[in-house]
Curated annotation (Swiss-Prot):
NCBIfam families: crcB. This is Fluoride-specific ion channel FluC. The gene is fluC. The lineage of its organism: Bacteria, Pseudomonadati, Rhodothermota, Rhodothermia, Rhodothermales. It is a multi-pass membrane protein. Fluoride-specific ion channel. Important for reducing fluoride concentration in the cell, thus reducing its toxicity.
Length: 133
């Protein structure tokens, strides 16, 4: 039961961060691309890469892991919204914008997971066995 409370708390914080990123991403950018969702997903990719390394190195408790990964990052990132927005762009005839959203989200997402993990490994001074290094 306590684990569910940690997930709910992390989820609340992640959702608030996602909303904040969506608001910030709208400032000065053209509404042709769903910038808020893209920003949330890319920030989440970076965070999950780095925090996964730290969790392995410092043996985060199960409660802390579900708070961060299931609750926080799980509610910050949003695959379903990303998929819907990409589909809507395609259905509106904005094929290049839709395909660019898919390509940028996936390629930069993978790159940012790797960069986040690399940053954490650098800060730790080397490979972390539990991360597969």
């Amino acid at each position: 039961m306590l684990k569910l409370l940690w997930i709910a708390l992390g989820g609340s914080l992640g959702a608030l961060c996602r909303y904040g990123l969506s608001v910030l991403a709208r400032w000065g950018l053209p509404p042709t691309v769903p910038w808020g969702t893209l920003a949330a997903n890319l920030v989440g990719c970076f965070l999950i890469g780095g925090l996964w390394v730290l969790a392995a190195q410092y043996s985060f408790s199960e409660e802390l892991r579900v708070f961060i990964f299931t609750g926080g990052i799980g509610s910050l990132t949003t695959f379903s919204t990303y998929s819907l927005e990409s589909l809507l762009l395609l259905r509106e005839g904005r094929v290049w914008a839709g395909l660019a959203n898919v390509l940028v989200s996936n390629v930069l997402g993978l790159v940012l997971v790797a960069i986040g993990a690399g940053c954490a490994l650098f800060l730790l001074g080397g490979p972390v066995a539990a991360f597969g290094a």
